[in-house]
Amino acid sequence: MLDRLRAAWRTLTSPLTTGRSIAWDSAQPVSRLKDWPPAPSAPNAPWTNPSVLRARAQHEYANNPMARRAVDCLTNACWGGNGIMPLFRDRGVQALWERWARACDASGRLDWTAIGAVLLQTVIVSGEAFVILRLDEAAPGVPLSLQVLGPEFLDESRTDDRTLAGIRYTGLRPAGYWLFKQNPTLSGASLESVYVPTSECLHIYRPLAAGATRGQSWLAPVLIALRELDEYLQAALVRSKTGALFAGFVRSAEGGNPLSQAGAVPALEPGSMVRLQPGEDVEFSEPPPIETAFDPFVRAQLRRIAAGLGIPYELLSGDLSQVTFASGRAGLLEFRRTVEAVQYGLLVPLFCEPVVRRWAEVARAVGAMPVDADTTVRRWVAPEIEMLDRRSEILTDLLRVRAGFASRSEIIGRTGWRAEDVDLEIASDNVRADSLGLTFDSDPRKTTQQGQATPTAAEQEARS
């Protein structure tokens, strides 16, 4: 037994005793990995040349339909048509917030929902955004307004012993930002920058590494794939259009190149006959066939892009031809986790909560609400991703409520409604139905789940 243990030990330690070292295959300096950067990158390495990445991402969003669809899909899922709304404990505070949220944009054009959508779209495309919290007497109820700025407003030329690329630090924490008064990308814009403390400016970005102080475009991993796929599709379209012209060419037996003469190049039109010289031979163009692997190749590239963005392929492409109920449900479940990570890991802590805190401070300072008003947010209501089988979702929620695992307020809140408002509407509907002598299956006072009349108290007593 002792000999076997010694032999096993020698086997395990042989690389050390023979002078050889244990190494990972992925770290070997082999030729096929020569283009793989061997040195680790710093957390803020992407920002050594931020304008190029940002400009390319913005260009693809403006011109590439797949890039536009990807950004809109993430924005709609994470922020939605109603945005992420706070539910306050105090109904008076809630009413004051809802009044302010309808016109809280510094430009006077957008509401809370639209501002959040613009903010998230800017963060996805450009990697980061700034929100200025301005004191504004024109804002309804509470004199505070919001202004969303892109990363190009940061004056990165400002650098000293406490300022790095336009961001001033106190220890490890940012203390403020040097921001241009006007968009520096506009012709004739002033390049004067002003210092804005963090109490009046929010910096919204998703750090991709520990210690990252700036964000990068979420499109960065797929920018090349998006552009090259778009170029491939455009080339295929041009090739098909050219082939569809089906032109005929008259070939001269005498040779020569009449097309070399100035102004002799004719336009190709469907059914046209291009005369080269008087003469002999007619030759028809042969339209190039569409590759048999065209659709599989495009689908593979779109799946790659969707994976890089964390979006189901079906939502990115709109192609539902290969979706089954099980695969669609599995994809939506994973996408829901991605969306919730953005909602509760980025938007709520970095944007929604700081805005509510500042809004409450200003409201108390100007007397818009009592000093002792309860501004506690009971719940943040985010847009819900509906599943494929809505019936099973509702039954699951019903069982959770009946088992005590969830409250009606929680279930209703996920739909964007307040439980109190739903209860008031139900009570109002019941009063109106009773006055008109109407009975609905949705009224448990009068019908059971099976649609039968609910026994009255006298009938129940008689049965017992």
What are these regions (language model features)?
Residues 112, 133-135, 239-245, 316-320, ...:
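Short coil/turn segments at secondary-structure boundaries
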Residues 1-12, 329, 346-381, 385-464:
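C-terminal anchoring/interaction modules
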Residues 13-32, 252-263, 445-464:
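Intrinsically disordered, low-complexity linkers and terminal tails enriched in Pro/Gly
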Residues 202-331, 369, 377-378:
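Extended, charged amphipathic alpha-helical segments
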Residues 1-82, 461-463:
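N-terminal-proximal low-complexity accessory segments that begin disordered
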Residues 138-141, 184-186, 282-283, 315, ...:
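Flexible loop/turn segments at secondary-structure boundaries
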Residues 109-132, 290-391, 395, 440-443:
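C-terminal amphipathic alpha-helical
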Residues 62-209, 400:
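Structured, mid-chain assembly/scaffold modules that mediate subunit interfaces
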